[in-house]
Curated annotation (Swiss-Prot):
This is Protein KTI12. It is found in: Cytoplasm; Nucleus. Belongs to the KTI12 family. One of its GO terms (biological process) is regulation of transcription by RNA polymerase II. It comes from Saccharomyces cerevisiae (strain ATCC 204508 / S288c) (Baker's yeast).
């Protein structure tokens, strides 16, 4: 049965999602008699004895990757779902795991947790019982190699924004991938109700970039409009000797009535002056977090304004 591979920054909510997924999949198995032969094995850094310090040097990292590979080889089988909850941030390693799955003619999916670095550092400080050293945490964020759904070893890819998404919203599509029949099962007439007709991942089972081929360009254009509006507001106040700190900037195009449901705005922080470099950095983060999500164009502006309000204040 499949390998479900979690990937993401440290302290981005992977373990919470992975354990919730175990519960949801087990509930599916318990509620579906024809799935009763399936079992779930969950592996994490903690269960495999991998410590934070093992990520410091490349030599130690090779050892921890060997631990994960060994666990997958040992446990992956026709009737066992293996969930790996680790950083898995090197694309070559994800490819290696994909090859192990392919050798068994079973299925595979990647679940990526997306989370703003500011939130990660806050969670690490306030909510993590075993916090990462800030310097190592920052290094691992810089090292991270983003999965790409166009690569077969990163597909099917489910990208989940942990501060606001819930894995229950994705569970039906994940189940369609997890419980699809393997080649051998197909030949033997296997007929699980959750896998019927799902021999290959398709648009119903995979979270892919939005339908527009230029979606990233659309994200860039819409977010750039908002940044331009904010910078023009700051410049206009500065030119007359005013102060932009603590002011509200309406960034909705063509709608200026604050009581209108279509109006959205950005509140500039009181304590410091917002710079173009700061806005561009937040824009890049926003695009990176949303490039795999299916967002209507008219929702990009309000979502980006909300993202700025959360990260500027």
């Amino acid at each position: 049965m499949p390998l479900v591979l979690f990937t993401g920054y440290p302290c981005s909510g992977k373990t919470t999602l992975a354990k919730h997924l175990v519960q949801l999949l087990q509930s599916k198995i318990d509620a579906t008699p024809s799935l009763s032969k399936y079992s779930i094995t969950y592996h994490s850094d903690e269960s495999l004895g991998i410590k934070h310090s093992d990520y410091i040097t490349s030599q130690d990292e090779r050892k921890l990757r060997s631990e994960i590979i060994s666990a997958v080889k040992r446990d992956l089988s026709k009737n066992k779902i293996v969930i790996v909850d680790s950083l898995n941030y090197i694309k070559g390693f994800r490819y290696q795991l994909h090859c192990e799955v392919k050798n068994l003619s079973t299925t595979f999916c990647v679940i990526q947790t997306l989370c703003p670095p500011e939130t990660i550092f806050e969670w690490n400080k306030t909510s993590n019982p075993n916090p990462w050293e800030p310097e190592l945490l920052n290094q691992l964020i810089q090292r991270y190699e983003e999965p790409n759904s166009s690569n077969r070893w990163d597909s099917p890819l489910f990208a989940i924004l942990t501060p606001q998404d819930n894995i229950t919203d994705y569970i039906d599509d994940i189940c369609k991938v997890v419980f699809q029949t393997s080649k051998s099962a197909k030949n033997s007439g296997h007929n699980d109700p959750l896998s019927k007709g799902l021999q290959k991942p398709n648009s119903a089972t995979v979270l892919k970039p939005a339908s527009q081929s230029n979606f990233i360009q659309v994200l860039d254009i819409e977010t750039s409009k908002i940044i331009k509006t904010i910078m023009n507001h700051i410049k206009s106040l500065t030119s007359i000797g005013g102060v932009s700190n603590g002011t509200r900037v309406i960034v909705s195009e063509g709608i200026t009535d604050i009581n209108d449901d279509g109006c959205f705005f950005v509140d500039l922080p009181i304590g410091n002056v917002v710079t173009l470099a700061q806005l561009q950095r937040l824009k890049r983060q926003f695009i990176n977090f949303n490039k795999l999500r299916d967002i209507d164009q008219d929702r990009i502006g309000p979502l980006f304004a909300d993202y700025l309000n959360k990260n500027l204040n």
